Amino acid sequence: TIDDFNFKCCIGKNGISKKKREGDKKTPAGTFEIENLYYRPDRIKKPPTKLKCIKIKKNMGWCNDIRFPKKYNKLIKIEKNIKYEKLNRKDYKYDLLIPIKYNSKKPIIGLGSCIFIHLTKDYKPTAGCVALKEKDFLIMLKLIKKSTKIKIF
C-alpha cells in the first residue's frame, strides 16, 4: 500500500521469514530501504520516477556467491568463476528492477542476497523477491522516492 494505492504482489515460494537464508525461497520480513531503479532500455523507455535510473547492461549481475564476501549481495560485472543473478535476463522479469536493501550494508554471507522488487505477469511465487505487474510497478515508481521504505510482514 502506498498512499491510497493497494498493489497485488507475489512473494517467495516459501513465504515470509525473519530468518531468511540464501536459497530458502523466502522473502525477508522487516522494513527495508530501497536502491536505484534498474531498467532494460532495449525493452522499456526510462520511466518517470524520483529514483536514480540505471540502464541494465549485458555484463551486469548481482553476486550471490558465498565464496566472495567483498562482492556478496552487490552489483558486479559478470565474471566466469563467480555465481550471480544475471540482470539482463531473456525473460521480462528484470526489465524493471529495484533492489531491496536487505543484508546489504555489511552483508553476512549466507543470510540471503538478490532480493528485488521486479515484474511478474502471473503472480507465480518468486525465489524470495517481491514482484508486481508492470502497470502497478509503473504507478509505484511515480509515488516513491529514495527515502521510501518497503515493509514486508
Where are the model-predicted features located?
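Cell wall/extracellular polymer interaction/catalysis modules
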Residues: 1-127, 134-153
